[in-house]
Amino acid sequence: MTHIIIDGDACPVVDSIIDLTTETGIFVTIIRSFSHFSNQLYPPHVSTLYVDDGPDAVDYKIVQLSTKDDIVITQDYGLASLLVDKVLIVMHHNGKIYNSKNIQQLLDKRYMNAQIRKQG
């Protein structure tokens, strides 16, 4: 069964995903660090899982929990690169699908931009 896992620390479309999946039978799991804790109540098909605030803790939990039938929503290219061959779909919150053909280019671009920022 398809399940949506959201990298919830910085995802601006959580509410939209929840609205779109209501009454579809698709379960949604939002994974967040404790520093992004929320008291917001969600419908029964939505669960929230909190992890420690450590670096990449949310990413590691998503990798651990995801299966071949899952859809993962993230804007983290590093996380996406770990999942493109593991899950059904990995996508950015803007709808861009990450795949084995485009992920290396995105990682290279991220690296080059970081190098430029270091140079000032």
Indicate where each model-derived feature is located:
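Nuclease catalytic cores that cleave nucleic-acid phosphodiester bonds
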Residues: 2-120
